Design a protein with these regions (language model features):
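Helix-loop-helix "hinge/cap" segment bordering the ligand-binding cleft or interdomain interface
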Residues: 1-66, 83-129, 134, 139-141, ...
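Short, solvent-exposed loop/beta-turn-alpha elements that line the ligand-binding surface or hinge
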Residues: 79-96, 169-174, 231-253, 372-380
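Conserved small-residue motifs centered on glycine
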Residues: 206-333, 342
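A ubiquitous short alpha-helical element
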Residues: 3, 88-92, 313-322, 337
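Ligand-binding "clamshell"
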Residues: 148-169
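Histidine-centered catalytic/metal-binding microenvironments
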Residues: 333-380
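Substrate-binding rim/cap in mid-to-C-terminal beta-strand-loop elements of soluble/periplasmic
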Residues: 170-177, 185-188
């Protein structure tokens, strides 16, 4: 049973909006605005610089927290992705736009706008900084209200986190497409009841009979924000445009429509959103998280110009199997050393040369051959 990955869109800039308003800062629209807000938070609120995960950008295509994809996208670059340029697919980590981005990130690191300790931080460490009010701005996907922001609200109910969609290309926000599937549920041969997998998936994700005696148990599971990894089967099976569907389904219910014929997963979130809107000042952090993620963030995706760039290849070639691990290590080391100043920006050219010589050119050829062969096969 494959997991069907949804289109999660680009990362948002999540901001302590109570701090922003207190300091009379304009709502962020560009990366320049992002940096000005971080500078102000550092100066007047004693906050850390912009937090970043050392992976810097997404690999398989998933949006994740604390990543700097938007900076690369602003230079028309999508690291770790195979992007078509001038008729052939290229590994975008070696694109000249990456060099430009790394140079700028080095400047931010040197200034402290990019957290000086990001090379040493773990995700748990970053979450602690957020929860205890030492961080007021992060990049993250639509779901970060569920983790870690919900815990920040529990710790300090006066914290008002708000998502903003940052423009990377004129009036649009660009991001790359995701791998269609990356996880699978397998059942051993001879297992007595393999159909139970499909039944569980149907209960969690499909349309649900709302007169069933156990429906409240399932709905409550979502309403109290149980972590998805606690599910009996820890995969998502949904439409690619599930976020759009969820936003419109919940919006319909909030506007008075019946919850019948609405996907089961959306109904408890709609209830949580209703509860939040009924009393914003005295409400649970979980209700806020449902509204901030499912209405505020997803609403921004629907109401703004969001452009998806196609990632052309997600499989594995013969040379990738042997050498890609080493090339990824080379890439990570080069990126982090340039940002931190251990290597000059010009080292990027040495990295690209080494990447090509140590298997990158061969992999590029293999990727393009596979893509061409698939295109030819689809034409016959």
């Amino acid at each position: 049973m494959p997991e069907t990955n949804i289109d999660a869109g680009p990362n948002f800039f999540w901001v302590r909006d109570d701090w922003r308003k207190e300091l009379n800062l304009q709502e962020p629209q560009t990366l320049d605005d992002v940096e000005n807000i971080v500078r102000a938070f550092m100066k007047y609120k004693g906050a850390d610089g912009l937090m970043a995960d050392t992976s810097l950008t997404t690999g398989t295509g998933f949006s994740s927290e604390y990543l700097l994809n938007l900076y690369f996208a602003a230079n028309n670059t999508y690291p770790k992705q195979w992007i078509e340029r001038n008729g052939t697919y290229q590994y975008d980590s070696i694109n000249e736009g990456a060099k430009t981005t790394l140079s700028h990130l080095h400047d931010l690191y040197k200034e402290g706008v990019l957290d000086k300790n990001f090379l040493l931080r773990t995700s748990n460490d970053i979450a602690r900084e957020i929860i205890y009010g030492r961080c007021g701005a992060i990049f993250g996907p639509w779901w970060v209200p569920n983790n870690p922001l919900v815990d920040a609200i529990k710790k300090d109910s006066s914290a008002k986190w708000k998502p903003y969609l940052i423009k990377t290309n004129g009036n649009s926000t660009t991001y790359h497409s995701v791998i269609p599937s990356s996880k699978f549920v397998v059942v051993r041969k001879g297992y007595k009841h393999p159909e139970v997998i499909f039944k569980i998936i149907s209960v969690i994700f499909d349309y649900l009979r709302y007169d069933h005696k156990n429906v409240e148990d399932v709905n409550r599971y979502y309403e109290i924000n149980v972590d998805p990894t606690a599910r009996p089967i820890a995969i998502n099976v949904d439409y690619q445009d599930a976020l759009k569907r969820s936003y419109y389904n919940i919006s319909k219910i909030l506007n008075g429509a019946s919850s019948k014929n609405i996907m089961a997963i959306d109904v408890p979130y709609a209830t949580a959103c209703k509860n939040y809107l009924a009393n914003k000042k005295e409400n649970s952090a979980e209700n806020w998280a449902a509204y901030a993620s499912r209405i505020e963030a997803l609403g921004l995706l629907e109401k703004n110009n969001v452009v998806k760039v196609k990632s052309g290849y997600f499989s594995t070639t013969a040379t990738m199997n042997k050498k890609m691990w080493k090339l990824k290590e080379l890439e990570s080391d080069a990126y982090l050393q340039i940002i931190s100043g251990s290597k000059p920006v010009s080292y990027f050219d040495d990295f690209v040369k080494q990447w090509k010589e140590e298997g990158g050119d061969t992999i590029t050829q293999e990727v393009n051959n596979e893509i061409r062969n698939k295109e030819k096969a689809s034409e016959t």
